[in-house]
A protein has these predicted regions:
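Short, Lys/Arg-rich, polar N-terminal cytosolic tail immediately upstream
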Residues: 1-3
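Soluble catalytic domains of membrane acyltransferases
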Residues: 5-8, 13, 20-157
Length: 157
């Protein structure tokens, strides 16, 4: 990784962490249970656009995340994807590149954040849970770290 990207990652991680700590009174419970090494899939509920960066800044290790490709249309979200090495998924077809990239990352002992709902508040919208987490665990033996994201609707509360 180049030095500029490293510096950007530190700056952006710090900014997001401080923002969440001050505005949303961020509290992490059970951080001692997060594996320090080996492939890990952070499996969480998906409530807002802040969820992927929130996992990234609280995990204590580098975490990539899967995201719908349409997010690259927003310059800020595209920038976050670049900084945190997002894996973009084309959701409207049977694209295999994202699967291969994720498998390779997990086999290289990297960590990935995934949201089985497949979209924000998917279960509330009647969506079914996607099978991606189970597929990647069976293929790679990655550990699953459950993530529950609560609150965030009302800043400063």
């Amino acid at each position: 990784m180049n030095i500029i990207k490293r510096i950007l990652r530190v700056i952006v991680r710090t900014a997001i962490y401080l923002y969440c700590k001050v505005v949303y009174r961020l509290k992490v419970i059970g951080k001692e249970n997060i594996p320090k090494e080996g492939p890990v899939i952070y499996c969480g509920n998906h409530r807002s656009y802040l969820d992927p960066p929130l996992i990234v800044v609280t995990a204590g290790r580098h975490v990539r995340f899967m995201a719908k490709e349409e997010l690259t249309k927003n310059k800020f979200l595209k920038f976050l994807g670049y900084v945190f090495d997002a894996i973009y998924v084309k959701r409207d077809n049977k694209e295999i590149a994202a699967l291969k990239t994720t498998l390779k990352a997990l086999k290289n002992k990297e960590s990935i954040a995934m949201f089985p709902e497949g979209t924000r508040n998917g279960l509330e919208k009647g969506e079914s849970v996607k099978e991606g987490v189970a597929f990647f665990v069976l293929q790679t033996g990655a550990k699953v770290q459950p993530v529950g994201i609560v609150g965030g609707e009302k800043p400063f509360k």
